[in-house]
Amino acid sequence: LLESVYAYAFQKKVRINKLKEMLWRDELATHQKLLFHGAKSEIHGAIDLTRGRKNNDFGQGFYTGESYEQALSFVSGFDQSSIYFLNFDDSDLKCRKYAVNQEWMMTIAYYRGSLDAYKDHPTVQKLIAQSRACDYIIAPIADNRMFQIINAFINGELTDEQCKHCLAATNLGMQYILTSEQAVAKTRL
């Protein structure tokens, strides 16, 4: 029966995942957010903050996004990939929110390895401390193309204003990064 339902939906171009997203959004309470995680393989057990790469935008953490399509774009080329819907309750959690600005650019540059020569500089140390003094982060997504622009800024090829204008034009959406066990405990897969 389920196979025939899916076959009918496919034939009629019904976007089942979009319907599922709408139903999940209807069930959200205050302080709850619907987030999406694209995984290259199935998640077994609880969310593990140590599984992610250390050279992601904000270091190790559990990376999620605001849209199904966004999560899909990160894992669509992998055979065993999955998209997870998450119910995230942000009440009583400390958030660090970033905008497209110099602080955001330099924090990403640090975690992606472009500021290794300056890792002991007080400004970089302050950025690192601020990025870890929270339970979760909300920040603009920086894909590899955006990172090339950030690197051009770090290398002195662009001013910070030129860099911000280039990056603001890409607008890939916002990412939510869970960075503490408290945030994980308030997230339901």
PLM regions with names:
Residues 2-57:
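ADP-ribose/NAD+-binding catalytic cleft of ART/PARP-like enzymes
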Residues 8, 74, 149, 153:
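Residues that form generic nucleotide/phosphate-binding pockets
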Residues 17-19, 30-33, 49-60, 66-128:
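ADP-ribosyltransferase catalytic core
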Residues 40-42, 68, 182:
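A broadly conserved detector of short glycine/acidic/proline-rich loop/turn motifs that flank catalytic sites
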Residues 60-63, 137-139:
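Short cationic amphipathic helices and targeting signals
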Residues 87-189:
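Active-site and NAD+-binding cores of ADP-ribose-processing enzymes
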